[in-house]
């Protein structure tokens, strides 16, 4: 009996240690904690299942200890509900959970990113010298795409993205060979139809914006490690319009 009590104490001690680690992790980086919450829960219950399995393998199955096992299980669930999920639970007994906190954090990050994108766009426009308007002339589509690409690079650098401008006709005639080779992206048929209708598409974290302002082009944005925002599509298209003012 004393051995059983000792094992229970050890189990509760381990639970307390894990709980303190979770608290430390939460206060150290709340945003990262919210992002990794589901992974933490899976790890938490995975450790519980493994520990119970190992215990049975070593000690054998003893149904007389069901009260102790029930208490241990209740403690594991309590830590999950009281700390990992709270206050993001909308329904417990129906096994339906609404991770409100994660959603709020996601919206908050999107709003902050959108505001930052707006400030970047405004800064680029303000730094353009109006005296340059109406002074440029592009004799070929290649010259135009290079000029537009150089203008859009400043926006791409500031948001940590890669922007490349392609001639639309050339890409359509080669089954998007240029885009596929540079971005390792396969464009589904339905997206090609949308591009033909002058509608922007997004394949994973790569956005493609059709623009027919001076010349028919596809503007490709690779967000890399940063998620693309809807504001990015709007800003890049508006910058393309702004770039057209340079034309004679």
UniProtKB/Swiss-Prot annotation:
One of its GO terms (cellular component) is plasma membrane. Its main location: membrane. InterPro entries: SpoIISA_toxin (IPR025940). It is a multi-pass membrane protein. It comes from the Bacteria. It is found in: Cell membrane. Keywords: Cell membrane, Membrane, Sporulation, Toxin-antitoxin system, Transmembrane, Transmembrane helix. The keyword Transport does not apply. Belongs to the SpoIISA toxin family. Probably forms a complex with SpoIISB in which SpoIISB neutralizes the toxic activity. This is Stage II sporulation protein SA. It comes from Bacillus anthracis. The lineage of its organism: Bacteria, Bacillati, Bacillota, Bacilli, Bacillales.
């Amino acid at each position: 009996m004393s051995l059983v009590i000792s094992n229970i104490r050890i189990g509760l001690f381990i639970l307390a240690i894990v709980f303190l680690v979770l608290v430390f992790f939460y206060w150290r980086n709340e945003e990262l904690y919210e992002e990794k919450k589901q992974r933490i829960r899976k790890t938490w219950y995975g450790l519980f299942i493994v520990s119970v399995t190992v215990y049975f393998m070593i000690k054998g199955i003893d149904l007389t200890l069901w009260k102790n096992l029930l208490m241990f299980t209740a403690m594991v669930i309590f830590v999950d509900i009281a700390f990992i999920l709270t206050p993001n639970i909308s329904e417990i007994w129906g096994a339906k959970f609404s991770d409100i906190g994660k959603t709020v954090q996601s919206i908050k990050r999107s709003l902050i990113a959108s505001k930052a994108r707006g400030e970047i766009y405004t800064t680029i426009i303000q730094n353009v010298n109006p005296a340059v308007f109406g002074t440029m002339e592009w004799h070929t589509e290649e010259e135009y795409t290079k000029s537009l690409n150089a203008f859009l690079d400043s926006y791409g650098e500031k948001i940590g993205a890669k922007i490349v401008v392609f001639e639309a006709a050339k890409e359509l005639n080669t089954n998007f060979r240029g885009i596929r080779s540079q971005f390792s992206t396969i464009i589904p048929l339905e997206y090609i139809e949308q591009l033909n209708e002058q509608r922007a598409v997004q394949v994973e974290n790569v956005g493609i914006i059709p623009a027919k302002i001076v010349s028919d082009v596809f503007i490709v944005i690779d967000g890399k490690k940063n998620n693309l925002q809807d504001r990015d599509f709007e800003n890049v298209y508006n910058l393309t319009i702004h770039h057209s003012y340079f034309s004679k």
